[in-house]
A protein has these predicted regions:
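Terminal low-complexity/charged segments
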Residues: 1-214
Length: 214
């Protein structure tokens, strides 16, 4: 390396680094992966069997403010972005699942965020959802998780063990499918063939006139 070469060090965030160390020490083996984005945010991924105790531990560490909980479907959409020309053959799409920050091993995950109200520090918690498509409820830990879990169950089909009432909030009880899954077909995703194609429908009587002309 010459004297003119410089190395760029990754930015450090001592405050969040110290807080992440405190969190991972408290959670122990439950933490599968963690990430601190300097001057931005913190992420952890925990084992499914420690999901509820993770919430309890974080609350005891001062993360008493529940922000949100939802599901993630990492499957690349088989419909693409709905921007292709419908008259052209369907292009080949990459079906590789990439789970984002702190990784993962499953198509579906649950993500939640909690904060310390007096320090502005927050942490995002992810957990893999296996084929049982269920995880323990956080309702007994954070009351605000109630309707977030209901919505996640309704839109992704992820169950929450111990939840007092997982009835649908938006959809009819007999609705089939889960609208926020990537493989759920939404007609609104399909680009209408305009202005490249003009779809002309025959007017009433056109068929008769064509028959007379022949």
């Amino acid at each position: 390396m010459s004297s003119t070469d410089t190395t760029t060090e990754a930015p450090r965030d001592e405050r969040r680094d110290a807080e992440m160390a405190r969190i991972t020490d408290a959670l122990g083996a439950a933490v599968l992966d963690s990430l601190v984005k300097a001057n931005d945010d913190m992420w952890i991924r925990v084992s499914a069997d420690a999901w509820r105790t993770t919430g309890e531990t974080l609350k005891s560490l001062g993360y008493s403010y529940f922000c949100f909980l939802s599901g993630i479907d990492w499957l690349p959409s088989p419909f693409g972005k709905g921007e292709e020309d419908p008259t052209e053959p369907t292009p080949e799409r990459d079906s590789t699942i990439k789970q984002g920050y702190t990784g993962g091993a499953t198509r579906f995950q649950v993500i939640a965020r909690v904060m310390q109200p007096f320090t502005s520090l927050g942490v995002n918690i992810k957990v893999d959802i296996d084929d049982s498509m269920a995880i323990d409820s956080w309702c007994s830990v954070y009351a605000g998780a109630n309707w977030h879990e209901r919505e996640t169950h309704e839109m992704f089909g992820i169950g929450f063990n111990g939840h007092p009432d997982l009835r649908n909030m938006y959809l009819p009880s007999d609705f089939e499918g889960f609208p926020l899954r990537k493989d759920f077909p939404l007609l609104a995703r399909i680009v209408k063939p305009w202005p490249g194609i003009v779809d002309v429908e025959p007017l009433p009587g056109d068929d008769e006139q064509e028959g007379e002309a022949s």
